């Protein structure tokens, strides 16, 4: 059986997604208990697509025979039905830890990558490179053959050989134990034909303009298995009677606006012809522009990359604003959003801010919106590198491995997890006081008396540096009595601090410990400091004060750290590992921690990536940071 193939084409804003949903809804209404109807969209669009489909089905058919999938969810469903879903999927954290472990094991065999092993973020770059090679089905044999090519010499040749070595070890370590998304995609292509729910299914594919070789292999199998496949592509066409001509300059030129979509159409057509040389795909062209209702926006959509001379259009649909700094730009956006909401009746959910350079602008837009009381949602995962718990683990581990230096000890103390302040019932100068003020007192004391070593922090004798400077006959004066009371309280404080740190140091410094034992020591350290109850208290306080992003961070960070610990044990559990190597594994894992933020409600401004977002129903869009080198992006 060969599937019927239909391309739904049209320029941006012509309603291709609406056409897919309407066609799917009509099919479900006509045959509610028939074959499966599947909508395949990019991963970041699955939620929005499910919601739109549910809204279109509200007064008609149900979801019984309908699925909304990204490739990841499709792979999971097929593997559940055909076998292979039992293997745990390695997380990004786990992959980075595993790659770091492989690099450390092969350190003596590497000559090019050895210089980068200790560099921050290298395992992330390496992991993404390997994933990209697997998506393009470039095996280690291909890499080695390329390395031996006479046209490739020196450093590049050696780099390819080392990359092949790392990929082989990664595959061997994961074989039968772990899987990742690229491996699941290979299994999806191999097992798709055995999935009962895909036999004779009708499939709509929307939101893509390109498919990598792994995805093309999946389409090859879908053309064998499904009954009908509808694929929407953003490109232009020209109607000539009953035919649609697509070989237009904007499509066929390598620099054409729709060249990528046209090449995808040709590649998919060639796949279909491989199966059935007589097959001819249908083309459904949508020409009417629905999104750009204003004349100026419609003209820009048509001529942004053209050379036609445009007559001036005064409809205020497009404004160009220049500011001196990104901070002023963020404040101007916040101010204008307030104007729209107050004076023109816009809802916040109808407004979006599109950002190309998220690292720069997220940290400026969020406080600017907070100052104006504008509810907003950052539609991107936020690194949790600087969350107090991540900082505690990093600083405490460095204290254990590098010695109890002033910087590392006080970095750990300022996270807020240590029992700095005594219990209210204790006869202590700092009981019931501000813990940050107490840490300031302790820091000043350590600076004044040069306390910088583990031996000084863990000394059994009391700290009495102040008392040594006070003559016996003046210790009863009010001023000196306070100084002595402060010193006694600081001594009790350092003992409460030193006890858990000292135990952690003993476990982490041992040369004969396994990764499991070192990870257990970190967990016991967090348990001794009551980190989980503290995070819960912080979360409740943040919720009560309306700081929903902070509440989400406190809620997720514990689970993220437990995942990190599990991956550390999974990768190197019973192997003896040096303190240095474990420190590097932990550091890489902490760098990979991320927090997914939850929208604060139904009515909020969305801050989203310019490259990848799932925005729909937006009436106003602010595009910030439109600078040379950023848009279009240099390189």
For the regions a language model picked out, list residue spans one by one:
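Polyanion-engaging groove/track-forming segments
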Residues: 1-635
């Amino acid at each position: 059986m060969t599937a019927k193939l239909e391309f739904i084409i049209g320029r941006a804003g012509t309603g291709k997604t609406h056409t897919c949903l309407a066609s799917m809804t009509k099919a479900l209404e006509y045959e509610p208990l028939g074959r499966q109807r599947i909508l395949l969209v990019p991963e970041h669009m699955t939620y929005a697509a499910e919601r739109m489909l549910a809204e279109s089905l509200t007064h008609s058919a149900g979801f019984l025979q309908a699925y909304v999938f990204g490739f990841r969810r499709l792979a999971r469903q097929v593997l559940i039905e055909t076998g292979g879903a039992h293997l745990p999927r390695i997380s990004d954290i786990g992959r980075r830890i595993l790659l770091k472990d492989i690099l450390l094991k092969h350190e003596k065999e590497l000559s090019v990558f050895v210089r980068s092993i200790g560099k921050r973020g290298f395992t992330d770059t390496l992991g993404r490179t390997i994933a990209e090679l697997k998506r393009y089905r470039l095996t280690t044999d291909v890499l080695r053959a390329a390395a031996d090519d006479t046209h490739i010499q020196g450093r590049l040749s050696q780099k390819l050989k080392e990359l092949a070595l790392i990929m082989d070890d990664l595959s061997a370590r994961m074989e039968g134990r772990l899987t990742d998304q690229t491996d699941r995609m290979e299994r999806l292509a191999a097992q798709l034909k055995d999935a009962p729910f895909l036999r004779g299914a009708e499939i709509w594919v929307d939101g893509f303009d390109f498919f990598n070789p792994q995805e093309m292999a999946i389409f090859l199998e879908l053309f064998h298995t499904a009954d009908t496949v509808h694929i929407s592509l953003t490109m232009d066409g020209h109607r000539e009677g009953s035919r649609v001509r697509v070989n237009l300059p904007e499509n066929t030129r390598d620099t054409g606006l729709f060249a990528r979509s046209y090449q995808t159409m040709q590649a998919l057509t060639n796949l279909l012809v491989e199966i059935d040389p007589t097959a001819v795909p249908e083309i459904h062209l949508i020409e009417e522009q629905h999104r750009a209702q204003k004349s100026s926006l419609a003209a820009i959509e048509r001529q942004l990359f053209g050379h036609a001379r445009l007559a001036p259009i005064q409809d205020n649909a497009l404004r160009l604003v220049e500011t001196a700094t990104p901070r002023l730009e963020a404040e101007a956006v916040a101010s204008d959003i307030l104007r729209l909401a107050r004076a023109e009746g816009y809802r916040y959910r109808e407004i979006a801010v599109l950002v190309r350079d998220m690292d720069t602008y997220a940290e400026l837009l969020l406080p600017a919106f907070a100052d104006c009381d504008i509810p907003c949602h950052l539609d991107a995962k936020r690194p949790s590198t600087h969350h107090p718990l991540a900082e505690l683990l990093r600083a405490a581990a460095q204290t254990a491995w590098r010695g109890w230096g002033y910087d590392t000890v006080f970095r750990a103390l300022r996270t807020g997890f240590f029992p700095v302040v005594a219990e209210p019932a204790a006869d202590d100068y700092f009981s019931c006081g501000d813990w940050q003020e107490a840490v300031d007192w302790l820091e000043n004391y350590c600076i004044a008396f040069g306390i910088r070593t583990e031996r000084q922090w863990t000394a059994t004798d009391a700290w009495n540096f102040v008392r040594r400077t006070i003559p016996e006959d003046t210790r009863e004066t009010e001023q000196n009595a306070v100084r002595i009371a402060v010193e006694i309280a600081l001594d009790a404080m350092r003992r409460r601090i030193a006890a858990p740190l000292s135990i952690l140091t003993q476990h982490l410094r041992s040369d004969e410990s396994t990764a499991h034992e070192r990870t257990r020591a970190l967990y016991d350290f967090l348990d001794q400091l009551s980190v989980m109850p503290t995070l819960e208290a912080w979360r409740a306080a943040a919720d009560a004060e309306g700081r929903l992003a902070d509440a989400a961070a406190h809620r997720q960070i514990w689970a993220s750290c437990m995942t990190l610990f599990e991956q550390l044990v999974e990768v190197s559990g019973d192997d003896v590992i040096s303190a240095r190597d474990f420190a590097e594994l932990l550091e890489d894992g902490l760098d990979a921690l991320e927090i997914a933020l939850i929208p604060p409600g139904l009515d909020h401004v969305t801050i989203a990536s310019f490259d990848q977002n799932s925005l729909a129903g937006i009436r106003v869009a602010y595009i910030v940071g439109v600078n040379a080198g950023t848009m279009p992006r240099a390189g």
